[in-house]
């Protein structure tokens, strides 16, 4: 294999999945990919399963920590930077690419100290703490949404790397003569407010207008959610997980979900209209900013959790289900926002920096 590239990403799938897509692209171009993570994040399952070598450093966040932890923070940071620098000196990568998570801060600083160019990719419309702090040290900044880094002269709007199979080419069958299909996504852990809200809302939609329902309720939430639908008199298929998202998106005409960065990018890739209920406690309210990206272009409805009740959601569902042409217009708007070249664009940017 060729020269080494070091990817830094950890903690959640929102950071790790785009990084994995880029890792595959680097490999396709002949590079050897190494990964810098932490001992506890989701990367410990996903990265080895992808056949990549995972190097770990001890890195933790600072938000919400007590005074003792904050006093220890400078020493912990020095330790994690030292660990990362030792790994970087051994691997001698041509570039280091940070996708977010606690590992990105010390890893990026170590790369800068070692003279290795750093590239940052931010998935959300509002930059995470680690990426925000790393930007001054970065040779190039890739943003998924326009104007995330308005003060950076080195930014490039690339979009979020999304699996190629989610870019659906086949047009959906017309709604004439059939029921609409509603996909509800609660995430792997489940979004309990959505699990409670949707059965109540759908019960208030006229039976002849009510869509077919597929509800992904999350681990340990499927049985109680299915019971809520039964109690509400609404037919629904409820599952804890969805293994094949391409199939699920291809089935759906409309999606109700949270507004994580990857979800937003996947909805655009699949050309799907949506009703977005951002997680109200997300750091810096970044999900609302993510959702606004689709909403202001007419591809989604932004429905804040604090002000959206069952009657509000039922009214909105009724409105769009009575206007199939509205759903099609929203689908076209979503498709216009898709970034099918995002993975290639991020990797191109990295290699321009590495070999420029």
From Swiss-Prot:
The keyword Membrane applies. It is found in: Cell inner membrane. This is UDP-N-acetylglucosamine--N-acetylmuramyl-(pentapeptide) pyrophosphoryl-undecaprenol N-acetylglucosamine transferase. Cell wall formation. Catalyzes the transfer of a GlcNAc subunit on undecaprenyl-pyrophosphoryl-MurNAc-pentapeptide (lipid intermediate I) to form undecaprenyl-pyrophosphoryl-MurNAc-(pentapeptide)GlcNAc (lipid intermediate II). Keywords: Cell cycle, Cell division, Cell inner membrane, Cell membrane, Cell shape, Cell wall biogenesis/degradation, Glycosyltransferase, Membrane, Peptidoglycan synthesis, Transferase. It comes from Pseudomonas fluorescens (strain Pf0-1). PANTHER family: GLYCOSYLTRANSFERASE, UDP-N-ACETYLGLUCOSAMINE--N-ACETYLMURAMYL-(PENTAPEPTIDE) PYROPHOSPHORYL-UNDECAPRENOL N-ACETYLGLUCOSAMINE TRANSFERASE 1. GO terms for cellular component: plasma membrane. One of its GO terms (biological process) is cell division.
